[in-house]
Amino acid sequence: MINIKVEDYDYIMTFTSHNRASYIYQHLFRKNIQVKLVSSPNKINISCTQAVKFKEMDKDVVQQELKKNNMYPTAVYRIVRKGKNENYELVE
């Protein structure tokens, strides 16, 4: 039996375009910040197909990098897990 480790992320941020999400993902990834580029859940964003997930421990660094790169997410949500389902609480 193969055990697959699933990484838990604490936040998800959405952007106005796929290019912005991809750009900030690549930038944060190169800085060794644990991020994941994912499809935007329909529950929170229908205008862009991509979103970036990140961990609580990286929140301050992510915010600093967004400001340094003049990137502003459409919204940031806290991921709330209930069993296998994810719900989202608007943070900013």
Language model regions located:
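C-terminal structural segments of small proteins and small subunits
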Residues: D60-E92
